């Protein structure tokens, strides 16, 4: 839901400040963030997709659910579940996706973590501590509290799901966004799910074939 701190959380993780540049303080596009963390003495990469929380962008949220490997539901501790939070839960459950709940803003004086968990339980989201299967991380994006716990749970859940790509295969992925640049020509933001994409390769989208002239990460 809007204002629950999704972009602020990603800013904290990625050490960026994207929230300051958003029109009206809300995310209006799907943004991809590629980060590397250390997990059990190994380097691990995570690609985050930041989705808009405003009600006007439900199609974007559904699109992300359809292409992601696992979901992080960010809920503000001082606001609990709101209409777009519930909508996201329905999308996640319908697509049977692995879920981690991040209860954000626990640093606020009016935070009510118990209410958030009770509201989540109404939608069959029960924490591991209460006998369920869903990891629920209580954190603060503002103070950096328990951010490491969230990242570790993401990696451990991904390993449990055996999410591995075969770099020898032809690339398969999804186009998150595309536009026509006056100097570069057609530009697309692509999430590669499997295989490797290289300059000079051809990509096929519906009935269109395009050659890759440049790749920027």
PLM features per residue range, with description:
Residues 1-49, 188-194, 201-204:
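Conserved G1/Walker A P-loop phosphate-binding module
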Residues 3, 20, 82-83, 103-112, ...:
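Ordered, soluble secondary-structure elements with a strong preference for glycine-centered loop motifs
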Residues 3-5, 11, 132-217:
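Conserved catalytic-core segments of large NTP-driven translation/proteostasis enzymes
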Residues 17-24, 37-44, 57, 82, ...:
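Active-site phosphate-binding and catalytic loops of NTP-dependent enzymes
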Residues 22-70, 77, 91-93, 178:
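Switch I (G2) and immediately adjacent beta-strands of P-loop GTPase domains
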Residues 55, 66-86, 93-114, 187:
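Conserved Switch II/interswitch segment of TRAFAC-class P-loop GTPases
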Residues 105-132, 145-155:
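GTPase G-domain guanine-specificity segment
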């Amino acid at each position: 839901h809007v204002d629950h701190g999704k972009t602020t959380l990603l800013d904290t993780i990625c050490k960026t400040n994207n929230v300051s540049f958003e029109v009206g303080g809300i995310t209006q596009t799907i943004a991809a963030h590629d980060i590397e963390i250390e997990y059990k003495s190994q380097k691990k990469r995570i690609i985050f997709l930041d989705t808009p929380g405003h009600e006007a962008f439900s199609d974007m949220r559904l699109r992300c659910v359809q292409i992601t490997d696992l979901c992080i539901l960010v809920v503000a501790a001082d606001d609990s579940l709101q209409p777009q939070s519930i909508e996201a839960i329905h999308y996640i459950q319908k697509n049977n996706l692995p879920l981690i709940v991040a209860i954000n803003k626990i640093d606020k004086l009016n935070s009510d973590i118990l209410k958030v968990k009770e509201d989540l339980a109404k939608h069959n989201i029960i924490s591991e501590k209460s006998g369920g299967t869903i990891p629920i991380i209580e954190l603060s994006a503002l103070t950096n509290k328990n951010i490491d716990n969230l990242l570790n749970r993401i990696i451990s859940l991904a390993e449990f799901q055996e999410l591995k790509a075969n770099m020898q295969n032809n690339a398969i992925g999804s186009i998150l966004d595309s536009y026509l640049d006056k100097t570069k020509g057609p530009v697309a933001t692509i999430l590669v799910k499997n295989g490797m994409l290289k300059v000079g390769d051809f990509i096929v989208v519906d009935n269109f074939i395009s050659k890759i002239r440049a790749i920027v990460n």
